[in-house]
């Protein structure tokens, strides 16, 4: 049930070796759902469905190097890393050095059986629409969120200008209400209008100073 309602599952417990039962249960769950492990937009290894990694690769929009085409084509046809190492007389450490950058860039993922698979990007889609829909899905369950939190959640593939444009779009279509401050928090917050209580009691701030060095300073130019 948890996997059916989660887009990404980060393997925190098993990576730290603190919960053997969680490790066993996770192995059986990812096998049952045929999940793959790869790098998300924040650089964390996560379990997710193949289609999700296709979306992430589209958002990254990073071209492959010509010298990487041979290994990517190999893992389009088969998923056996041992066969690749045998054909190329390659040690396991050499193989890891070869595939690690491709895993970080999202071009390769690993399946639940230990094999590798090349990620083919989504075709005939508008990149901006994909990014916008990804950000919408990212923030839709947060009743209150700051711009800096959105920036950290989105990852390095999103420029501050893109986040700013999406936040403006969310205001226009009613997904979020405009920035406000909450007690004990110094950052500007955005919130879901339908999830916030006591909207009528929110008071206007007297003054607000945004440092010029803030990467999202341009957002506030129109406010």
Positions of the model-derived regions?
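Long, low-complexity intrinsically disordered regions
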Residues: 1-223
């Amino acid at each position: 049930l948890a996997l059916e309602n989660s887009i990404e599952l980060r393997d925190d417990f098993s990576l730290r070796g603190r919960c053997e039962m969680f490790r066993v249960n996770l192995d059986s769950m990812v096998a049952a759902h045929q999940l793959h492990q790869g790098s998300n937009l924040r650089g964390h290894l996560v379990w997710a469905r193949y289609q999700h990694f296709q979306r992430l690769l589209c958002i990254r929009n990073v071209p492959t190097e010509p010298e990487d085409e041979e290994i990517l084509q190999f893992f389009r046809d088969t998923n056996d890393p041992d066969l690749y190492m045998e054909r190329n007389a390659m040690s396991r450490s050499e193989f890891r050095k070869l595939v690690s950058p491709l895993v970080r860039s999202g071009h390769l993922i690993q399946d639940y059986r230990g094999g590798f698979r090349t990620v083919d990007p989504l075709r005939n889609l508008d990149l901006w629409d994909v990014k916008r829909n990804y950000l919408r899905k990212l923030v839709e369950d947060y009743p209150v969120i700051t711009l800096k939190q959105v920036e950290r959640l989105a990852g390095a593939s999103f420029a501050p200008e893109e986040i700013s444009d999406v936040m403006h779009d969310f205001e226009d279509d009613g997904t979020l209400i405009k920035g406000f401050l909450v007690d004990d928090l110094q950052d500007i917050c955005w919130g879901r209008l339908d999830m916030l209580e006591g909207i009528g009691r929110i008071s206007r701030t007297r003054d607000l100073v945004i440092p010029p060095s803030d990467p999202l300073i341009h957002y506030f130019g129109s406010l």
